[in-house]
Amino acid sequence: MLELQIKDLCVAFNGKEILHNITFDIENGAFIGIVGPSGAGKSTLLKQINRLDPSKTGGSILWRGKDVDDYDVHELRRNLAYVFQKAVMFDGTTEENIKLSLKYGNEFKPEEIEALYQTVLEEASISQDILDTPAQDLSGGQQQRVGIARVLLMGSPVLLLDEPTASLDVETSNKFCQTLKQLKGGPAAKDGKKRTFLMITHRLEEAKFLADKILMIESGHVVEYTDC
């Protein structure tokens, strides 16, 4: 089953071409590592997928056969969840920060939520002893796990990861990648289909460790899309 189809996507800003005729397909359950030099258009591509960037000049992006422009934007972003380089922590405890995602719509019954919450904590490698800790006091790696836990609790079937390890040291980055490795191929809580990941990284070794396929972008062009 195709999860995403990007067809002849073109993006320009202030007359400058950012992405040129980007075309590729992503199967449900795949983990795609996106690599390339700074300024190549990697983040622009991810932001196009869940409509965070309005600069598209041509082409289309289909999620499960339907153009992303035809979805309600809130529904789209609940399903195609964006995880930024540094997860935003709000005032409150770690638990309160994770459960914020429950305010933005889900399809779970009240009696299902606690069981799902416990599963998410385990999947995101969040220990019970930090749940009462102010989220802003957590380490960088712990905060990134909280960011992942939020989207897992929403049941988002597609995770768009924009350099989630960029601000982490090597040891913390390796631990975070192990967490992602465990999530890879797992069922999305919302619909039972497998989770699909697109992750930008500047570290080729991370892409090879995690990904099924690597998409290389240079100067707004796809120069390689290959199995790992």
Where are these regions (language model features)?
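Helix-to-loop junction immediately C-terminal to a conserved catalytic motif
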Residues: N50-R51
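Conserved ABC transporter NBD signature motif
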Residues: G58-D67, L76
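ABC-type ATPase nucleotide-binding domains, specifically the catalytic core motifs of the NBD
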Residues: E96-E112, E123-S125
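Conserved ABC ATPase "signature" region
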Residues: E111-I130, Q178-K181
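Conserved ABC ATPase signature
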Residues: P134-L138, Q142
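Hydrophobic anchor residue at the start of the ABC signature
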Residues: I148
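Catalytic Walker B motif of ABC-type/P-loop ATPase nucleotide-binding domains
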Residues: L159-E163
